């Protein structure tokens, strides 16, 4: 098995395969032990490698992970961006090759500055710290791409009890630590004290996760809210067709009018497919309907802001009418779907760079939450719900979470189900109920433990009825966010860096 840790193609191909295991640990498959196996194979494959070889070993791992785990991007480019098969394949491969460097550069840093082969316990801790740093970096760099985090595999796994304590970050840290410790355990057998400490580090977090699973960190803030969520199932090719606007508005109106004994009616992202000011009459009429039902109607709608120079800015928004108030403007935009980077160069080259409604501006920070039926509602539009820290900041001020989306762009791929899993994790992290309304699925109600209690299947029109309970109180994660864990990771990385620099004087510290 030494070939795994040697430079060359056999090790690189194993890293590619190990990376491709990543999506199998996540939704919709959820074979969560594969997350540990995947990372363990990468850790073993980096042992003893020089910097350049480690960089390419990490790159191949990343190519496997993103190539398999974000293959739904091809669907968006080909099916809805009108790109030919060769062009869509080229763009998909180019994207995958680029984001694979998220793993390549940390692998190089590990080999050059942090790895200590003669300190198995300290090495495992430093590797887990670097893994956490990588996931944090991915959530921020170039607006972020926080997809395929290892911690999502534990949504309903043994570590679920740790998620309200440290978020998906703590789950990822423990998985990476467990993977490295399992690789290093054979080296600890001759050393009784080190072996005992290694077993405590390996088994302790899993025992804590099981012990805390189901613990109630938050409690009810009032009576249950009766919710109706509408899933219109509008085909993407009809979504922005001007000739289909009236039909879509009539559909959502007609599905909502018969609903009785309801507190919240929720429509998906851009369910109103025209600008808010152009739909003012329609929204006003629906607000009157909601008032008559003593309910609030919350819908996605694009928003126009007229500027002093006569120009306009456009936003992806959510607005409330009836028994509530507020309009929220999306802050985390999807590249190419909602804005085009370098648009002066790319606009018009191919249809994918000129999609409908792909010229949105970013909403301002520190917007007030939505208000409905006397409660604060934390809004997330589509992609925003995948950002743990961003979501936590809003959740801490709220009693109910709301996410609206249009995942039609991703067809029958695994993308929408990965997206749903991340939304479930936000509910678990915050200890709050979440309402999720989508155009074509999965629309659902998620409880504070991340479990789906009501849902409408994908690709069908439907009306979901259920109840959510407004919650108050803060989980440890909402109180402290990632900072305690990030501080620990920083100490571990500094320790590894100093230990590496002082290697001649090091005396098997931690190992």
Curated annotation (Swiss-Prot):
Membrane-protein topology: Multi-pass membrane protein
Main location: membrane
Gene Ontology biological process: lipoprotein biosynthetic process
Pathway membership: Protein modification; lipoprotein biosynthesis (N-acyl transfer)
Enzyme class: transferase
Residue intervals of the CN hydrolase domain: 230-470
Keywords, comma-separated and alphabetical: Acyltransferase, Cell inner membrane, Cell membrane, Membrane, Transferase, Transmembrane, Transmembrane helix
Function: Catalyzes the phospholipid dependent N-acylation of the N-terminal cysteine of apolipoprotein, the last step in lipoprotein maturation.
Family: Belongs to the CN hydrolase family. Apolipoprotein N-acyltransferase subfamily.
Protein name: Apolipoprotein N-acyltransferase
């Amino acid at each position: 098995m030494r070939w795994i840790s040697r430079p060359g193609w056999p090790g690189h191909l194993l890293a590619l395969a190990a990376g491709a295991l990543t999506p199998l640990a996540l939704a919709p498959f959820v074979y969560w032990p594969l997350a540990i196996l995947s990372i363990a194979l990468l850790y073993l494959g980096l042992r003893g490698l020089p910097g350049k070889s480690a960089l390419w070993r990490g790159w191949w791992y990343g190519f496997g992970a993103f190539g398999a785990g974000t293959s739904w991007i091809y669907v968006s480019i080909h099916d809805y961006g009108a790109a030919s098969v060769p062009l869509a394949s080229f763009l998909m491969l180019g994207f995958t090759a680029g984001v694979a460097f998220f793993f390549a550069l940390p692998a190089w840093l590990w080999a050059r500055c942090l790895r200590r082969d003669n300190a198995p316990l300290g090495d495992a801790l430093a590797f887990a710290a670097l893994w956490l740093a990588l996931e944090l970096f991915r959530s921020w760099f170039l607006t972020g791409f926080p997809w395929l985090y290892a911690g999502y595999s534990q949504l309903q796994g043994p570590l679920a009890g740790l998620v309200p304590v440290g978020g998906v970050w703590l789950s990822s840290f423990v998985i990476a630590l467990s993977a490295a410790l399992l690789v290093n355990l054979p080296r600890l057998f001759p050393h009784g004290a080190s072996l005992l400490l290694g077993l405590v580090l390996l088994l302790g977090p899993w025992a804590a996760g099981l012990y805390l699973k189901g613990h109630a960190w938050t409690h009810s803030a009032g009576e249950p809210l009766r919710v109706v969520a509408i899933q219109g199932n509008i085909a993407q090719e009809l979504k922005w067709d001007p000739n289909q606007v009236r039909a879509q508005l009539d559909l959502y109106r007609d599905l909502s009018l018969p609903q009785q004994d309801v507190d919240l009616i929720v429509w998906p992202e851009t369910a109103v497919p025209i600008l808010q000011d152009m739909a003012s009459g329609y929204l006003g009429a629906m607000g009157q309907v909601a008032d008559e039902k003593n309910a609030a109607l919350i819908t996605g709608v694009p928003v126009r802001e007229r500027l002093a120079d006569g120009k306009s800015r456009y936003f992806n928004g959510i607005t409330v009418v009836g028994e509530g108030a507020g309009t929220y403007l999306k802050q985390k935009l999807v590249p190419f779907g909602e804005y085009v980077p370098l648009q002066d160069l790319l606009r018009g080259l191919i249809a994918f760079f000129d999609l409908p409604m792909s010229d949105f501006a970013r909403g301002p920070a520190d917007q007030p939450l939505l208000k409905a039926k006397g409660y604060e509602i934390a809004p997330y539009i589509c992609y925003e719900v995948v950002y743990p820290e961003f979501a936590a900041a809003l959740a801490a001020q709220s009693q109910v979470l709301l996410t609206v989306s249009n995942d039609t762009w991703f067809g029958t791929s695994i993308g929408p189900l990965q997206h749903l899993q991340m939304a479930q994790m936000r509910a678990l992290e915050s200890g709050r109920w979440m309402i999720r309304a989508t155009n074509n699925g999965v629309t659902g109600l998620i409880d504070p433990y991340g479990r789906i209690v009501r849902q409408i299947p994908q690709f069908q029109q439907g009306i979901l009825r259920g109840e959510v309970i407004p919650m108050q109180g803060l989980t440890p994660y909402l109180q402290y966010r990632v900072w305690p864990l990030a501080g620990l990771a920083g100490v571990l990385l500094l320790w590894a860096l100093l230990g590496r620099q002082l290697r001649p004087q090091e005396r098997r510290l931690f190992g």
